[in-house]
Amino acid sequence: ADFTTGAPTPTNSGNEAPAPQPEEPAEPEQPAPEGVTAIADIQGTGAESPLKDQTVATEGVVTGVWSEGGLNGFTIQTGGTGAEATDASQAIFVYMGDKPADQYPALEDSVEVTGKVSEFYGSTQLTASTVSQLDTPLEKVTPLKVDQLPEGTEAREPFEHMLIQPGEHTVTNNYSLNQYGEVGLAPGKEALRQPSDIFSPSTDPNSDIQKLTKDNAEKLVTLDDGRTRDYLKTDQNTPLPYIAQDDAQTIKSLRTTDTVSFQHPVIVGFSHEQWRFQPTTPVTGNAAGADLPISWEDSRAAELHAIDDVKGEYTIGAFNVLNYFTSLGEEFGGSAYTDREGNKVTVNRGKTRGAYTQSALEDQERKIVAAINGLDADVIGLSEIEDGYAVTGDFA
């Protein structure tokens, strides 16, 4: 049987329909798109789409798919493009919301997408209402060869969501690798210099330090993992991307100043105020090394032996004793972290830090002494030792 939807008509026991109640006016529906709109026309040449808030139909070749990990979408690019750069981007992100993975197209599929155009934190996208396979495949997309992205947001806008083949880059920071799977990259073979390492502090926008800060920001690009998950919170049991590989059976350091080469193309994205290189599918520490977008030489092994080559008669070391406080939490109040047996061990909140009880302090001291002796250094600098006056008010 065929069914159609309509307004419900409840009846009472006498089969008489009650008088209709006034209803709030419904939101006007977006008019159906007429024909296929080129992706470049959706993107336009400015920061925002000229077709923002309109419903359009467009078509393209699927170049990236992220059905897992939080991005919840895929990218399409105009068939046959990529050999040369154009004034407007030929690619766009298609947001799928909570649609299941089996409704996503596959890489290299040719599809038609109907959806509403929007700007999501500065990134042009379509929110898909329909996605359908084309009967005739489109011409393949060629990764655009770009040694390095131009500097600044305006110059990078034509590359938004495009499939590109970058040149060599250098790791300039890995602050967020353990949390969001991100690695900061600088174009070429040198990391970006810390401005305050060269120039004196200043808030003057024309000062050398502010100029270099701005220059660094315009050069920086973030290598991402194709996911938005937080490895410190929601994905604690997922191995980190890049430094872990092959189902976490391979561990490979990725250090600042390491030079990386791109063994696979990436998608240019923009989110959270950063331009990004996204792998064409999500990567975690379970991915094979050969499937990662980058390759690099592990520089750590060579550095481990560097200290043995230093000439001299004395060794100098540094050791963080991790909140060595002789003023105990049980004396100055506050809450405590407990061990498996419920014993109070370490200060959680309070005036002091470190050990909560005398027993915990003695245990900490034994471990510190053993570790310091293991350094076998002639001179050792210690950090995180209690400033007694700040706690007790006693200079002694």
Range-by-range predicted roles:
Residues 350-359:
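The substrate-binding groove and active-site-proximal loops of carbohydrate-active enzymes
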Residues 358-396:
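Active-site surface patch of divalent metal-dependent phosphodiester/phosphate bond hydrolases
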Residues 4-17, 27-347, 363-370:
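Extended non-catalytic accessory segments flanking core domains
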Residues 20-22:
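Intrinsically disordered, low-complexity, repeat-rich polar/charged segments
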